């Protein structure tokens, strides 16, 4: 029987013949077991154990691994370019080692001086795991020379010289310190993500660099990094700064496209998982891309049900999504015993930055959740849409980090060619209330703030109008923060919900509001 996949690249034995798997009704496991509660309560302890696992890796092995990375082989040229230019763009293919090695090289050559190197990440799990890895490579305790800062968790000290943090955390620091004086080098990683926070950070850092150089203060160096991004737009934005390209160290990845369109991509993913599971060796792990927690829990429940009736290696299913507690997120990196296969069910959180060892097969559903809103009604919507071509390649690259692999795309080659090349920037499709409030708090004019892509005027006007209605600013034409507005900036949440929290004690419903906020986030 023909494979339901068309391959790109070299031919490979067909491993996707139909299985006698009955089609079952997909179900969601909502049970809160005693075991789940115990794991949640012991989350901090698990987190500490996993941090210890990072640090216990053989130091000599880590040193040898560093030396084999492409970025390490051209380290002299990179350091020379950083010394020569205040701003540079670095395009490094998957596996080049740019995210872990560039900050270390800067520190080893003392280019940060008496200040600190900041490395931004769009997601919290990436900031944490990268910091743990770099601390292990530098043979230091996390929170000492190397640290991280994410929402509600700051693991740094006065000694910290390399700091991994989410872009949102650096934005909050800019409110009290617009010139970002505590940093001498800022690395803006995963620039292709184009979240609202990353786009605003580009402008904040650009203005801080210009102001510091104009005042003859400690100069600020900026390094913009990505594996896939629109280089021309970024280069133009940063005044034609130099661009350096790094080769990757990826292994061959064979791409297979579905020959037909799948209406039910969850079912297609489950079928593909077990077709591969029964025909490939154990300890060759799978990474499956889904759109959110509900889908992940649904697929996880069905995998466990089917595994009971299917021959093959034992299975460990690991979820990975933004709302998962940090301790459970880090379980993804825990090695499985011999003879057991790990299946990681992840959102696009696993597309970039983080490397999950032993992933040999990627199952790409080809979809992602995208946030949009209507300026007329103010209603937000989270829709499942096709991911971009760049995202598809990023996903495929997860299979080739440590060994040759394959990516099974549950969509046709024609469908892939019709997709947009890059992600649509969030700033042109999302509400900007929080962003505008932050810019005003930083002393910047939202109307003239330099952005790579200019948001619709209706978006900025709607944000100013809402802030005025909330009482956060005094007027719309030349907005200044009110006393309430200053209080709202202290909360890392939407200004609407921040005001609800502030007003809740007056109405005696603080606990209920906190519970609602917790559910929402």
Model-derived regions: residue spans:
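P-loop NTPase motor module signature
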Residues: 1-500, 504-507
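C-terminal helical accessory/scaffold domains
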Residues: 510-521
């Amino acid at each position: 029987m023909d494979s339901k996949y068309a391959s790109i690249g070299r031919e490979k034995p067909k491993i996707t013949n139909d299985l006698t798997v009955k089609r079952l009704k997909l179900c969601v496991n909502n049970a809160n077991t005693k075991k789940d509660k115990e794991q949640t309560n012991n989350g901090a302890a698990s987190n500490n154990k996993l941090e210890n696992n990072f640090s216990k890796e053989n130091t000599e092995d880590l040193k040898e691994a560093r030396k084999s990375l492409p970025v390490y082989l051209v380290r002299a040229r990179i350091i020379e370019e950083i010394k020569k230019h205040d701003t540079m763009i670095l395009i490094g293919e998957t596996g080049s080692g740019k995210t872990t090695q560039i900050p270390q090289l800067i520190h080893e050559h003392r280019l940060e001086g008496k200040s600190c190197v900041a490395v931004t990440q769009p997601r919290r799990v990436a900031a944490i795991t990268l910091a743990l890895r770099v601390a292990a490579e530098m043979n230091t305790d996390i929170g000492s020379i190397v640290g991280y800062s994410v929402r509600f968790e700051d693991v740094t000290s006065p000694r910290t010289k390399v700091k991994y943090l989410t872009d949102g955390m650096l934005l909050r620091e800019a409110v009290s310190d617009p010139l970002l004086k505590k940093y001498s080098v800022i690395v803006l990683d995963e620039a292709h993500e184009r979240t609202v926070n990353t786009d605003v950070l580009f402008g904040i850092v650009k203005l801080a660099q210009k102001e510091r150089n104009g005042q003859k203060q400690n100069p600020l160096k900026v390094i913009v990094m990505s594996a896939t991004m629109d280089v021309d737009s970024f280069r133009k934005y940063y005044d034609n700064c130099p661009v350096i390209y790094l080769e990757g160290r990826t292994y061959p990845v064979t791409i297979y496209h579905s020959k037909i369109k799948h209406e039910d991509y969850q079912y297609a993913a489950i079928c593909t998982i077990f077709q591969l599971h029964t025909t490939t060796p154990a300890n060759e792990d799978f990474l499956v891309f889904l759109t959110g927690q509900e889908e992940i829990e649904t697929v996880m429940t069905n995998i466990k049900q089917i595994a009971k009736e299917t021959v093959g290696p034992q299975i460990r299913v690991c979820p990975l999504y933004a709302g998962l507690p940090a301790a459970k997120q880090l379980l993804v990196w825990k090695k499985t015993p011999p003879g057991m296969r790990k299946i990681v069910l992840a959102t696009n959180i696993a597309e970039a930055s983080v490397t999950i060892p032993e992933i040999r097969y990627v199952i790409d559903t080809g979809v992602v959740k995208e946030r949009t809103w209507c300026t007329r009604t103010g209603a937000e919507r989270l829709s499942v849409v096709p991911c971009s071509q760049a995202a598809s390649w990023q996903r495929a690259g997860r299979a080739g980090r440590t060994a040759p692999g394959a990516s099974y795309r549950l969509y046709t080659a024609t469908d892939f060619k019709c997709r947009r090349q890059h992600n649509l920037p969030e700033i042109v499709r999302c509400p900007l209330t929080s962003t505008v409030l932050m810019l005003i708090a930083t002393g910047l004019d939202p109307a003239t703030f330099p952005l790579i892509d200019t948001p619709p005027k209706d978006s900025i006007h709607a944000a100013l109008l809402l802030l005025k209605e909330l009482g956060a600013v005094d007027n719309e034409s030349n907005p200044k923060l009110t006393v309430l507005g200053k209080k709202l900036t202290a909360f890392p949440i939407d200004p609407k919900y921040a005001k609800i929290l502030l007003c809740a004690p007056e109405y005696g419903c603080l606990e209920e509001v906190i519970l609602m906020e917790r559910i929402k986030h």
